[in-house]
């Protein structure tokens, strides 16, 4: 990052009236740095323009950052506190919630206390990493462990689950890593909204093609796909020469119903929101 033509004066402004005080510019525009304090040899920093001057001691300053820490992994309580921001349908309008790498405790909370309470959004979930990335039991047990994880979750038409994680390039850290597929599942729904409508299925070869995949943590075969789909888990499959595809469009609703399909649940969410909005203007007429 480079920021030019800045000032040490707190009231300094550019020709268009925006602040060029270096502290404000760094804190508002930098993606990596938060200003803490003036360096020792910066004369009159933080004063007004009339108080600021230059002397021979004001030399370019170079500072190296060291001793940082990535901190501790967030706890379930902290994550729940963050997700609870979406709990009120009146305050926050949201259609899709990403479960990221949620464990069973967090996934149940999102389903029961956010999506089932709001009834106007869907959460996208993935298996736990230990079940599908270098399976902690033994290779070949991925489908069984994924189904076991799904069976710890409640039945809900407001939740969707895929079958694996994907291996992709992380451009921000210049490494390859596994990431849960629920972000891609949500992305397919958004792309379907853009190209068609929410009541079209986001799965299949026409609308379910997943991008930016080096490989899948597990590529289920037909027998495994049948078991996963029966449990309400949507398999993600790489077909040679045809790409990687979301090969199912079920919700986590356990009982047979039209609402065990993603597109049906999303159709009714759209209808209910539209009816609610329209009825506001006739409520007291």
Locations of the language-model features?
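Outer membrane pore-forming secretion/assembly proteins and partners of Gram-negative envelopes
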Residues: 17, 28-30
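Structured, hydrophobic secondary-structure cores that serve as assembly/anchoring elements
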Residues: 11-14, 21-22, 33-34, 38-285
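Extended, beta-strand-rich, solvent-exposed assembly scaffolds of outer structural proteins
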Residues: 1-15
């Amino acid at each position: 990052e480079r920021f030019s033509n800045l000032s040490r004066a707190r009231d300094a402004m550019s020709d268009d009236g925006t602040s060029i005080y270096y502290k404000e510019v760094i804190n508002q525009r930098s993606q990596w740095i938060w200003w803490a304090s003036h360096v020792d040899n910066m004369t009159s920093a933080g004063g007004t323009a009339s108080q600021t001057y230059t002397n021979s001691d004001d030399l370019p300053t170079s500072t190296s950052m060291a001793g940082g820490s990535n901190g501790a992994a967030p706890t379930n309580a902290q994550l729940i506190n963050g997700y609870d921001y979406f709990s009120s349908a009146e305050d926050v309008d949201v259609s899709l919630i990403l479960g990221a790498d949620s464990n069973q405790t967090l996934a149940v909370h999102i389903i029961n206390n956010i999506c089932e309470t709001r009834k106007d959004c869907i959460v996208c979930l993935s298996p736990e990493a230990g079940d599908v990335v270098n399976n902690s039991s033994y290779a070949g047990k991925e489908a069984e462990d994924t189904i076991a994880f799904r069976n710890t979750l409640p039945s809900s038409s407001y939740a969707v689950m895929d079958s694996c994680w994907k291996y992709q390039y992380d451009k921000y850290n210049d490494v390859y890593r596994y990431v849960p597929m629920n972000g891609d599942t949500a992305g397919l729904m958004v792309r379907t909204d853009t190209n068609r409508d929410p009541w079209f299925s986001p799965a299949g070869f026409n609308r379910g093609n997943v991008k930016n995949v080096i490989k899948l943590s597990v590529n289920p075969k037909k027998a495994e796909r049948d078991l996963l789909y029966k449990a309400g888990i949507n398999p993600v499959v790489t077909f040679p020469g045809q790409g990687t595809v979301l090969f199912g469009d079920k919700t986590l609703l356990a009982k047979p119903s039209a609402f065990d399909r993603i597109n049906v649940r999303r159709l009714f969410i759209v209808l209910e929101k539209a009816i609610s909005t329209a009825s506001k203007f006739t409520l007291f007429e």
